[in-house]
Amino acid sequence: MIAKVVVENAAYSFDIAFSYQIPPAMQEDIRPGCRVLIPFGKSNRARQGLVMSLEEGEESKLKPIRMLLDLKPLLNEEQLWLTEYLHKRVFCTYYEAMRAVIPSGLTMKVKVMCSLGEQQAMPPEPSAAQQRILEYLKEQKKPVYIGQLLMDLGLTKNAPALKELFRIGAVVFSEDVREKTADSKIVMVRLSDGYADLLQSGKIRMTQVRKKVISLLEESPSASLKEVCYYAGTTRQTLDKMEEAGIISYYGRQIFRSPYADRHQEERTDSGVTLESSQQMALDTLWHLWEKKEEGPYPTALLYGVTGSGKSQVYLKLIEQVREKGEGVIILVPEISLTPQTVELFGRRFGKKVAVLHSGLTMAERADEYKRIQQGLADVVVGTRSAVFAPLKKLGLIVIDEEQEGAYASQSAPRYHAREIAKVRCRYHKAMLLLASATPSIETFYQAQKGKIHLVTLSKRYLGNQLPKVQIVDMNQSYGFDISQELTAELADNLQSNQQSIILLNRRGYHTAVKCNSCGEVIKCPNCSVALTYHHANRRMMCHYCGYSRDLEERCPNCGSELMGFNGSGTQRIEDELGRIFPQAQILRMDVDTTMSKLAHEVKFQEFAEGKYQIMVGTQMVAKGLNFPNVTLVGVLNADQSIYSQDFRGCERAFSLLTQVVGRCGRGTLPGRALIQTTSPDHPVIRQAAMQDYDGFYRDEIKTRKLALYPPFCTLCQVGFSGENEEYVRYGAMWFAREFQKKASGEYKDLPIRMMNPCEPVIARVAGKYRYCIVIKCRMEERFSRLMWEMLRAFDSEKKHKEVHIWVDLNGNDL
């Protein structure tokens, strides 16, 4: 029996399953999905690996596995299948795929430790460098992390002296392996099995305190150490003596860390939600589809309804019915800012059965929530993109709320889209996929129009509420003013009426650029090809791509002039401007800068809901999914921002954002109104968003997509290249384009492919690395996948490309 193992930190050129011998001691325990420590390469350096399968085969010439890291598989059968799927489909390495499937807190850290070898192996005449190493290790008296040794002695990573000592056996290396996060446990106390016999024997001296402890544990078979000490009025020392005497015993019980633990209530039998007739019809349709899921291909449905139509109430009822059948549910939201409201909605109904997964949790909290799901303690999972991998054993339904959002697409390896993972998981489990949105993605709505997925519509707002009245404000004659007179007047009316308002400006910071008024020089980031944004709170210029910052320039670095000025406005400036106009108003700013601390979104939104603030200013995090009944006014500043972007999805994003933010007002008993400030008042997207006319927008957009051959009429495959040397990056992109063209016109000439020439993206340099990209219009199928893998492995095998990183993104957001 041999193990097929994939290794961590593999390049494309050798990211394959390698064969390893299974030592006899591991034969019974090793399984696919277990992690192992293996000798790899000519140096036999220890590396982590993942066992993908066990096969019959000749093992005498194979290297043996050094260590089994998991006593039971970390990945189950489905998770291994997902790892393989991600590897093939989104062109990532096996280990990148595995790290997406499980939370980072469950990954292993392997440290190479260094210690002295046998005395007889010591060199008779060590060099000065060798002597320093030997003396250092002798002083430590225990194995030392090799990185610490190199740092303390000022040695380079490939220190020749250390290598020679290792070669002759004077120094030995070992591996220290541990999980990144350990389980959190509390000490529990229980009566020992033979405690009654001990008491009857008369050999144990009984005191009043001991009697109290025994009486307590007879009533409650187990209790925490803290509880026993408190209720029995005793100390740890007394309990230790009882344990030594054999009366009680200690054991550890895992506790799950969660910031939501204190508000998890008991599960209720009913949500208390009453559906209107249109909602009930939608629910009946969806439930009929769910009941038919075993009969054929897994059902996919789009719940398409105007903002405020009660889509979440419909799928809450659907989830209740799915759980009654004993199956679990995953609910995805696009951003952390939407998680608290969703957790509150489902927590009230399902109590402790709700698990939460998002990047705002600590590594340990994510690991513990994952374990709760894995152990069946939670069967309703709420979270952002990565929650789609939640290890529910019996999955019946996945709901993707605001399914059109770009946040569902990962921007780093593996570059997957949560919607695509949801599809394959539903197919695997014969579960149902429900997509919900007031502004569905063009691709999803196209499938619904073609009958490939079921379309369920809610055309009116809940309780008969009217859609907001929208006014388009032409800002062409308002140069220098961020807030129009019309919006100022409406804000004043709202403050007078004790109603709340939301202002959207999808740009953070105070000013978007610092510019010299003499020579026109714009202060740019030294690491990225973008202008620095001025932040007034700390008087610093900051890069929103790499995090670089520096003090505000008093003089132009180009010409020395002191005539420095500012361009553009961000949320910080709007907050200040509103504060000057309405000094009595309490203003809340919601952007990345104000929500960095843990659970900041939840705290701030709760305070706004309680009426502590009258105006909320924010970026796109205030535009989607939020429900504040007292918000009756929405103002949109600089609405043209994304319409004229080079991305083919620019108009779609602009329409969605405008429609969604307008839909935040008038959700209670009071009517809503919105003002959209723009310099393009006659632009079709602005007009259609103002009328909440998704159908009209879709008809226009789908014509453009078809004419230009964009999704859904093709798959856009972007191949990206990055590196610190611009010439190497450019050469790598040119090489790939040339070799790809040869294959595409040769053995793969049957594939429908259109390749664009290599070019720099809009932002050509990020974090000190130059970037090039190639866009390929194709049809994603098995042969195209094979072609891409051949190209990636060929590129990675060329020594000339050693300094260039390559990646692939399918239908990504950066196109």
Residue ranges and their predicted role:
Residues L751-E781, L787-M791:
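C-terminal structured "cap/appendage" subdomains that terminate the fold
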Residues E727-K742:
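Extracytoplasmic/periplasmic
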Residues A11, F582-A585, F740-R754, E798-E803:
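Short secondary-structure junctions
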Residues K742, G746, L751-V766, I806, ...:
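A carboxyl-terminal module marker
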Residues V171, I248, V354, I472, ...:
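Generic structural signal for residues in well-ordered beta-strands
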